Amino acid sequence: MDENKKRALSVALSQIEKQFGKGSVMRMGDRVIEAVEAIPTGSLMLDLALGIGGLPKGRVVEIYGPESSGKTTLTLQAIAQCQKKGGTAAFIDAEHALDPIYAGKLGVNVDDLLLSQPDTGEQALEIADMLVRSGSIDIMVIDSVAALTPRAEIEGEMGDQLPGLQARLMSQALRKLTGNIKRSNTLVIFINQLRMKIGVMMPGQSPETTTGGNALKFYASVRLDIRRIGAIKKGDEIIGNQTKIKVVKNKLAPPFKQVVTEILYGEGISREGELIEMGVEAKLVEKAGAWYSYGGERIGQGKDNARGYLRENPHLAAKLEADLREKFEPTELSREEGDEDTLEDTM
């Protein structure tokens, strides 16, 4: 750069600093670039698929899927992991449906959890913004976008048509929230529901969409699509769901990774089940017929018994997890081939 341009830039920078404060504009090389902090999800498979060891702090995350697919369970497990590390968690329950007993079973310290059950969408988002600006919250969950009902809709008649009201509310709120979220280093998770687009018949185009307009799709650094794909049985009794989680957007690591995990009723994501599956894949756990073995020791006949053995021997589970973390680097997880992309994967 020639001297005249340097002087002009120096004058401009000093004027900006005088008007807007020190640090308003800086050279990237002037500050140390730190790795993004992450909060574990409670699923080792998902943490590795996300590429940074969990969900990123200081960012917006969207988790969406059909009903009863495990969205709230996943967020409650992330809250539990955050609390274990001494973090503070808040839950904005716009659906008025949080079960504290179930949350406790997943490891959430319910006594320390900040809970709000707002009356309107504006109130929910204002409370969220105030908590974020306090700089004291490590993780916040808003459940759900679909339940953030604008005040005008609540005060109006049942059949009133108010097109685009919720989308405008979300767009305005995210414009305000995003900067505060970054400054306070808070992880904010929006749970969202699916709706069907009317008249979408184009081949290869998904008729599904999320509620609340397009703003959240753009502001979110990570978007997770979570779906139930099967049942887990113990004899004739169904004890949980087999669940597929797909990373459809990731600004911090390669996207489109996906994992298939187990969510057990009353327990949440099966840590031991994941360890067994990943152990077999990594050839750390041997499977001969119905028997599973680890380190030359038989750990159970059938997956359910092997899961129980690891639960009763936490030191063995911890050793297997350490071996798996060493074996599976985030870059080694490959995208599963042949899967259909769903719900605007390019967003």
UniProtKB/Swiss-Prot annotation:
Q: Where is this region: Disordered?
A: 327-347
| Annotated Pfam families | RecA, RecA_C
Record flagged with keyword Cell wall biogenesis/degradation: no
Q: Name one GO molecular function term.
A: ATP-dependent DNA damage sensor activity
- InterPro entries with a match to the protein in the record: AAA+_ATPase, DNA_recomb/repair_RecA, DNA_recomb/repair_RecA_CS, P-loop_NTPase, RecA-like_C, RecA-like_N, RecA_ATP-bd, RecA_C_sf
Which of this chain's residues are annotated to bind ATP?
A: 65-72
* Segments crossing the lipid bilayer: none
Task: Quote the biased-composition stretches of kind Acidic residues, using this chain's numbering.
Answer: 337-347
Which Gene Ontology terms of cellular component type are present?
cytosol
Q: What is the superkingdom listed in this entry's lineage? A: Bacteria
Q: Which CDD domains match?
A: RecA
UniProt KW keywords: ATP-binding, Cytoplasm, DNA damage, DNA recombination, DNA repair, DNA-binding, Nucleotide-binding, SOS response
Q: Where is the composition biased (Basic and acidic residues)?
A: 327-336
Cellular compartments annotated: Cytoplasm
For this entry, list what GO says about its biological process: DNA recombination; DNA repair; SOS response
Keyword DNA repair (UniProt): yes
Q: Which family does it belong to?
A: Belongs to the RecA family.
The UniProt function text for this chain reads: Can catalyze the hydrolysis of ATP in the presence of single-stranded DNA, the ATP-dependent uptake of single-stranded DNA by duplex DNA, and the ATP-dependent hybridization of homologous single-stranded DNAs. It interacts with LexA causing its activation and leading to its autocatalytic cleavage.
NCBIfam families cross-referenced by the UniProt entry: tigrfam_recA
Can you name this protein? Protein RecA
User: Which species does the entry assign this protein to?
Assistant: Xylella fastidiosa (strain 9a5c)
- What taxonomic ancestry is recorded? Bacteria, Pseudomonadati, Pseudomonadota, Gammaproteobacteria, Lysobacterales
What gene name is given for the protein in this entry? recA
